């Protein structure tokens, strides 16, 4: 659902997905949380992460409240008990995530992005640039397809990967 119609109980679906209900922190390191640098290199990965932070700032109602914490050493009282890895973290603010999402959504819609909600796509023909819409029983063409299914689309993603024999790798 679009961010204006998404009820609180739908924590895993809709615009922002589960991240919209997170604590509003963005880890700012390639050493944790993903494998982006493996595919684009360290420098490009950091550049892309900076773009993400910039976009959160751009759509934040109070961007001056976004802060970066960059711990350099574990506190003495923790050292004997935990082997923590310390990384820079941008604190966006939990209470602002939905406002940010709405502003971001409005921006995209005003730029001509068309969101199609609550529509089950059951197959994709990448060669002909068409998706099959289950309830319509027909294919719909697209110019650009952003495949952002989130957690609710894991099974569909697996089916597409198998159908197109896409390479996979262990995490």
Which residues does each PLM region occupy?
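Conserved catalytic/binding loops enriched for acidic/polar residues
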Residues: 40, 44, 48-59
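Compact, glycine/acidic-enriched structural inserts
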Residues: 60-67
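Residues forming the flavin
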Residues: 1-33, 38, 67-171
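Alpha/propeptide regions of enzymes that mature by internal proteolysis
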Residues: 59-60, 76
